[in-house]
C-alpha cells in the first residue's frame, strides 16, 4: 500500500514559494572540481544532506541561494531542519540528486557537464535568466520551483512510491489521472487533443514519461495556488 502521508508534497502550503534567501546557507567551493563533468562550477550548496546545487561563477549569489532556499522549503515544509520524508531523503542522497545552474543554454559548462556526467541525479537544469528571487515560482518569471520539483519527483518519488508516481504508461495513479486529463492515453502527441481534455501539453520534445513529470508539477503548483 502506498504510504499516502509521504506524498504530502502535493499538498504543500503556498508559503513554500515565498522561500527567503536569508536561510542558513553558505555558498561553498565546488567539492567536485576535479571531476571533469563538474569542473566548470565554482559555487556549491548542499541542501539538507541530500540535494546539491552547482553553479557557474557568473551566477549571482542571490540566485544560487534562492535555488537552495526553494529546495529546502520543498523538502522541509515544516522548517524543523529535517527532510519531511526520511525515505525521500535517503533516495535523493543515494542517487546524488542535484540541479546545475548554467549561465545560458549551450554554455561551455553545460556542454561539458552533459558530455561527461554519468550519474542518475540530474533530472533538470536552471539557467541564470530564468531565476528571479523576487517572483518565486511564478510562471514566466522564475522557473526555480518547477525545476527543483522535477528533480525531487523524478529522482525521488517515482522510485520510492511507484504505485503513486511511476511515469510509464498504465503504471500508477499519476499516469491514470494524466490519461483522463489528456482525454485519453497518447503515447505520441496527438495533432489535436479531444474536447474533453484539460491538459494540453504540446512540447514535442517531451515523451510520455516526461509528460507525466510535467503533469505532476502542474498538480503541485495548482495546489500551491501559483
Please report, for each region that a protein language model flagged, where it lies by residue.
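Metalloprotease/metallohydrolase-associated module, dominated by Zn2+-dependent proteases
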Residues: 170-226
Amino acid at each position: 500500500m502506498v504510504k499516502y502521508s509521504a506524498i504530502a508534497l502535493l499538498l504543500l502550503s503556498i508559503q513554500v514559494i515565498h522561500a527567503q534567501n536569508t536561510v542558513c546557507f553558505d555558498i561553498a567551493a565546488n567539492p567536485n572540481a576535479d571531476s571533469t563533468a563538474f569542473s566548470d562550477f565554482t559555487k556549491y550548496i548542499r541542501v539538507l544532506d541530500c540535494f546539491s546545487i552547482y553553479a557557474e561563477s557568473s551566477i549571482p549569489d542571490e540566485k544560487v541561494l534562492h535555488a537552495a532556499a526553494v529546495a529546502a522549503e520543498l523538502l522541509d515544509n515544516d522548517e524543523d531542519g529535517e527532510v519531511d520524508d526520511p525515505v525521500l531523503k535517503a533516495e535523493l542522497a543515494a542517487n546524488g540528486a542535484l540541479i546545475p545552474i548554467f549561465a545560458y543554454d549551450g554554455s561551455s559548462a553545460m556542454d561539458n557537464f552533459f558530455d561527461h556526467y554519468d550519474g542518475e541525479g540530474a533530472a533538470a537544469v536552471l539557467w541564470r535568466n530564468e531565476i528571479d528571487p523576487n517572483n518565486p515560482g511564478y510562471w514566466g518569471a522564475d522557473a526555480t520551483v518547477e525545476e527543483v520539483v522535477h528533480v525531487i519527483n523524478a529522482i525521488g518519488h517515482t522510485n520510492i512510491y511507484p504505485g503513486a508516481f511511476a511515469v510509464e504508461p498504465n503504471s500508477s495513479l499519476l499516469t491514470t489521472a494524466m490519461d483522463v486529463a489528456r482525454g485519453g492515453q497518447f503515447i505520441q502527441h496527438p495533432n489535436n487533443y479531444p474536447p474533453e481534455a484539460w491538459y494540453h501539453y504540446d512540447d514535442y520534445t517531451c515523451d510520455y514519461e516526461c509528460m507525466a513529470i510535467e503533469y505532476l508539477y502542474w498538480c503541485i503548483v495548482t495546489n500551491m495556488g501559483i
